[in-house]
Regions:
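N-terminal Sec-pathway targeting helices
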Residues: 1-17
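Generic hydrophobic alpha-helical membrane-segment signal
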Residues: 7, 103, 174, 191-194, ...
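Hydrophobic alpha-helical membrane-insertion segments, chiefly the h-region
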Residues: 16-28
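Short linear S-[DN]-x-LW-Φ motif typified by the pepsin-like aspartic protease active-site region
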Residues: 26-152, 157-182, 187-197, 208, ...
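Short, surface-exposed interaction patches in beta-rich subdomains
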Residues: 97, 140, 145-147, 151-161, ...
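Glycine- and aspartate-rich repeat motifs characteristic of hemolysin/RTX-like Ca2+-binding segments
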Residues: 178, 185-187, 197-199, 204-206, ...
Length: 324
């Protein structure tokens, strides 16, 4: 936590310094004269900072950015690990049975990108899967784990939808010991999920849970969106990069939330005094119930002698906690 606040303070100082430099150099230039970064720093430090060294450094960094910006490439298939022991299918995959609830299936692992995936309740006690419009797809059971892997490109499937689609059917009320859901671009919607541990990761896509029951839930959202409409969890850890997470439900022991530049909104069962708090806010907005903590590098610990704990860190984004 202390490292976090130190980082926030340093970041804020850099932004303030950058704003000062741009503002002063703009006024000195009167909108028409160009001042290099080296010229400006040399002037305001009375020559203590060398103009040539600063400009050489600035030119070098700029050139490296120009050389490498074209190499930035995101390939959905780079993030999906296909197993060479199983057939990689493509196109339309007819509905088939993976197993049933008597076969000792304990875990679920999903790695998908560029497609629309749904996890829905099965009509019977069988696990089934079907797919359409997929560039690559695997669905199998190994060592008690259901493995679903797939990627697709932007194209129409047989139903006229953009991109590929996958639908996994799970028996109603089935309990997984461990669940891992990894989504690149695209969307993943879950009708209901009961699990011991959950790791859910969203890159640039959208993940939605209608009903989630997890002893320990770890939710990680990069530049995408994640929504949990109904949560029941003992421990929940939520991390947001530049995306947004909205979570509604009940956490009975501990909730940790981190937000960099995105948005985190939590609507929790109970009252504000049901938790003890460890709060950190850099340049963002942090609001818990009726209290707001905005400003530069604020820290606050609140002991309500409660049985539950909440730790929140907000760098430059927005964290809002409400109670119902």
């Amino acid at each position: 936590m202390r490292k976090f606040m130190k980082g926030c303070a340093i970041t804020a100082l850099l932004f303030i310094l950058l704003g000062l430099i741009l503002g002063v150099s703009g006024s000195l230039g009167n909108g028409s004269t160009h001042f290099s970064l080296g010229e400006f720093l040399s002037a305001v430090t009375l020559g203590r900072i060398s103009e040539e060294k600063v400009d050489d450094w600035n030119d070098g960094v700029t050139e490296q950015i120009r050389e490498n910006i074209g190499d930035v490439h995101y390939d959905l298939e780079d993030n999906v690990d296909y197993d060479s022991d199983y057939e990689v299918k493509s196109g339309r995959i007819e509905l088939y049975v993976l197993g049933d609830d008597s076969q000792g299936i304990t875990d679920l692992q999903v790695q998908v990108g560029g497609c629309v995936m749904k996890i829905q309740v099965s009509e019977d006690n069988c696990f089934r899967v079907e797919a359409d419009g997929m560039r690559k797809f695997q669905g199998y059971v190994e060592g008690g784990t259901i493995e679903i892997r797939g990627t697709s490109k932007a194209s129409n499937n047989s139903e006229g939808n953009l991109g590929g689609s996958i639908c996994l059917y799970v028996p109603e009320g089935y309990y997984f010991e461990n669940t891992s859901l990894d989504l690149g671009a695209g969307s993943l919607s879950v009708e209901e999920l009961q699990t011991g541990t959950l790791e859910a990761n969203v890159g640039a896509g959208k993940m939605t849970f209608e009903k989630l029951d997890a002893d320990q839930a770890e939710l990680d959202c990069g530049a995408g969106q994640m929504t949990v409409e109904e949560l029941s969890s003992r421990v929940a850890e939520v991390s947001v990069g530049m995306g947004s997470v909205r979570l509604n439900g009940d956490v009975t022991e501990r909730l940790d939330g981190e937000c960099s530049m995105g948005e985190l909104k939590l609507t929790l069962a109970g009252t504000q005094t049901d938790f003890n708090y460890d709060l950190s806010c850099g340049m963002g907005e942090l609001k818990v119930g009726d209290d707001s903590y905005n400003g530069l590098a604020q820290e606050k610990q609140i002991n309500n002698n409660a049985s539950k704990n909440m730790e929140l860190e907000c760098a430059m984004g927005s964290v809002v906690v409400e109670f119902k």
